Each structure stands twice: as structure tokens, then as C-alpha cells.
Amino acid sequence: MVVIRMARGGSKKRPFYNLVATDSRNRRDGRFIERVGFYNPVASEGSESLRISLDRVQYWTNSGAQLSPAVERLVKDYSAKVSAAA
């Protein structure tokens, strides 16, 4: 089964997450099919902390992919932010 989840990167005490579409049997930071965005929880004020390709997330969910709970929350928040800005 394909899932969209966060793969951790960055260094110690400074996490950075890539939002990836991957097979559920792969390791958290292992092989993935496609990178659909990123999340930086410790971003400074001037830099971008979240970017998601909503059309690619929509494509994967239409193809049967499941969203992890954390990614589901981020997608919901990001789509609300994008629609408010438009």
C-alpha cells in the first residue's frame, strides 16, 4: 500500500521533514516514490516552513494512497492557508 508520510532529515535538534509517497513496507527514511513537499518546524521567520504540492497529493490519494495523521493535518492547514491567500 502506498502512504504519504514524513521522512526525517536535518541534524540533531534541528529536524526537517520531506513529505514523501512511499510503500508502507519501506523504512521511514528509506526509498520513496515521489517527494510531494517539505515541513521545517524550526524555520526562521523569513523562511518558508511548509510547502506541499496539493495536486500531487490529490493524485496519490485518488490512486489509493493513505495519508499519515501528521501529513493529513499539515495538508488540511496548508490548503486552508492557500485558499485564504487566493
From Swiss-Prot:
NCBIfam families per UniProt: S16
Family: Belongs to the bacterial ribosomal protein bS16 family.
Organism this protein belongs to: Bordetella petrii (strain ATCC BAA-461 / DSM 12804 / CCUG 43448)
Keywords on record: Ribonucleoprotein, Ribosomal protein
Record-given protein name: Small ribosomal subunit protein bS16
Pfam family for this entry, one: Ribosomal_S16
GO BP of this protein: translation
SUPFAM superfamilies reported in the protein's UniProt record: Ribosomal protein S16 (SSF54565)
A single MF term (Gene Ontology): structural constituent of ribosome
An annotated GO cellular component: small ribosomal subunit
